[in-house]
């Protein structure tokens, strides 16, 4: 095999592997808080402020991410800060076409774990 062809194949393989590790994921947060409470979420990813969202009871909001997604969340007097997407931690755990589905409840944040086919508590609210 000539050198140019070998190099071209190597470059193509490297780029395809790099592209697959930078896949986009969707982080979805669903509000399942008691008393029809609103959930306020302010997120940042890769140094970008993604703004503040108010998620009403039994509704959700999604972000498309490939890097760490860190969010401040609050409802009533309860506040917390959570990494709701970390590619090293979550890439293999998320389901449904690269979607990390979070359900926010009174006791904390639950993630649907694809391998276990169920929601599992990942983060408790501070003070719980």
Protein language model features and the residues they cover:
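Exposed beta-strand face motif in extracellular beta-rich ectodomains
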Residues: 67-69
């Amino acid at each position: 095999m000539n050198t140019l062809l070998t190099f071209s194949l190597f470059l193509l393989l490297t780029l395809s592997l790099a592209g697959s590790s930078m896949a986009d994921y969707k982080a979805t947060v669903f509000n399942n808080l008691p008393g029809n409470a609103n959930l306020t979420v302010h997120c940042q990813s890769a140094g970008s402020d993604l703004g503040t969202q108010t998620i009403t009871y039994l509704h959700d909001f999604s972000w498309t991410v490939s890097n760490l997604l860190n969010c401040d969340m609050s409802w009533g007097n309860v506040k917390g800060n959570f990494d709701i997407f970390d590619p090293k931690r979550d890439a293999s755990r998320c389901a449904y076409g690269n979607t990390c589905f979070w359900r926010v409840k009174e006791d904390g944040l639950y993630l649907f774990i694809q391998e276990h086919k169920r929601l599992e508590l990942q983060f408790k609210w501070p003070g719980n």
